[in-house]
Amino acid sequence: MAKSTILVALLALVLVAHASAMRRERGRQGDSSSCERQVDRVNLKPCEQHIMQRIMGEQEQYDSYDIRSTRSSDQQQRCCDELNEMENTQRCMCEALQQIMENQCDRLQDRQMVQQFKRELMNLPQQCNFRAPQRCDLDVSGGRC
C-alpha cells in the first residue's frame, strides 16, 4: 500500500512538472509570435540605412560633413522611433536585429563588411537607449552572410 501511494505521488509530480513545462513553452511561443508580428509591423528601413551609412563612410563626396552627419542622425532617430514601437524585450529586439541583418545581407560585399555591419547592428539598441539582447545570433540561415 505504501509503495502504491509513493508511486501515485511520483506520477502526480511528473504530471505537474510536465504541465508546467508545457505552459512555459507555450508562453515562449506566444512571445515569439508576438515579436514576429511587431517586427513585421515596424519599418526597419531607417535602421538599415543608418547602419549602411555608418559602415560605408563618405558615399557622396559633394556633401559637406554637416549634411552627412545630419542625415545619419535623422536616420538614427527615425530608426529609434520605429524600434520604440516594439516591446523592449530581449527577444523582440533580437528578432528586429535579425530581420535587419537578413534584409541587408545581399548588399554586404565581403566578410569584413559583414562583420562591420554586425558590430554596428549590435550597438544599435544602446544608441537608441534600449536594452541590448544578451545573446543574439545574427547569422543568416543558408550561410549567405
UniProtKB/Swiss-Prot annotation:
Induction: Repressed by water stress. Expressed in seeds. Not expressed in roots, pegs (budding ovaries) or leaves. GO terms for molecular function: IgE binding; nutrient reservoir activity. It comes from the Eukaryota. Keywords: Allergen, Disulfide bond, IgE-binding protein, Seed storage protein, Signal, Storage protein. Disulfide bonds join C35-C92, C47-C79, C80-C128, C94-C136, C105-C145. It holds the Pfam family Tryp_alpha_amyl. Residues 1-21 form the signal peptide. The keyword Metal-binding does not apply. Belongs to the 2S seed storage albumins family. This is Conglutin. It comes from Arachis hypogaea (Peanut).
